[in-house]
Amino acid sequence: MTRQAIVAANWKMNGDSALVDTMVSGLADIELSSHVDVVICPSFPYLSELNQKIKAANLNEAIHVGSQNVSEHESGAYTGEVSTAMLQNLAINYVIVGHSERRSIFKETSTQVAKKVHAALNAGLTPILCIGESEAERATGETETVLSAQIQPVIDEIGIEKFKDVVIAYEPVWAIGTGKTASSAMAQETHQFIRKFLAQQNEQVADKVPLLYGGSVNAANCEELFAQTDIDGGLIGGASLKAEQFKIICSAAKGK
């Protein structure tokens, strides 16, 4: 079946107002089909600015703004956190949840990630759930076990039916920012496993979930990756900071 193709830019802790301007002007003439969503996720201080400039450039139908994180709590004494209501107030559509850097550096657990997915869905936001294994885990044949253990708590939290409103981004930890990329065949094999894992509980829902690949995706390898049956787009890191590269990657998703 035809699923929504998504190309999401994760700027991480990079960029400034100048990058916002460069990206909006660089994407001004982007041509996309209706089944491709482009999402740009800057750091929190630039969410509103990016949204306003996208609207001013009449790009708001083609490009959405997303957050790199969100709290699982509605409000309260959680210094430094940002709630779903705050993102709603800024007209944010997407939110990245459970990125490997959040899991490893900030010690977010799969249970906490599941609660963040739930909070995002309750607020009408589309969560981009990140999962992925380390190089050591792949070397010892644990990839499927690790991914299952990251997905199952979310199923337990929200139920499989609600996955029709969830995007999953598979990012092998060993490929993030390293220049290493899973081969297209390896990426497809893992994406196929993820879809089959979901299908064990609900095949119809599994067929609808967009699965993105992340991990050193660039203008040179995006077309081959996106040509794979179960890869519906990408979560892009370093290459998303360069407007010309990012435009090429977005255009490659048109073939999905």
From Swiss-Prot:
This protein's name? Triosephosphate isomerase
Spell out the reaction equation it catalyses. D-glyceraldehyde 3-phosphate = dihydroxyacetone phosphate
Q: Assembly state and interactors? A: Homodimer.
InterPro entries (UniProt xref): Aldolase_TIM, TIM_sf, TrioseP_Isoase_bac/euk, Triosephosphate_isomerase, Triosephosphate_isomerase_AS
Q: In which pathway does it act?
A: Carbohydrate biosynthesis; gluconeogenesis; Carbohydrate degradation; glycolysis; D-glyceraldehyde 3-phosphate from glycerone phosphate: step 1/1
Annotated EC: 5.3.1.1
- What is the role of this chain? Involved in the gluconeogenesis. Catalyzes stereospecifically the conversion of dihydroxyacetone phosphate (DHAP) to D-glyceraldehyde-3-phosphate (G3P).
Quick one: which residues bind substrate?
N10, W11, K12, G177, S216, G237, G238
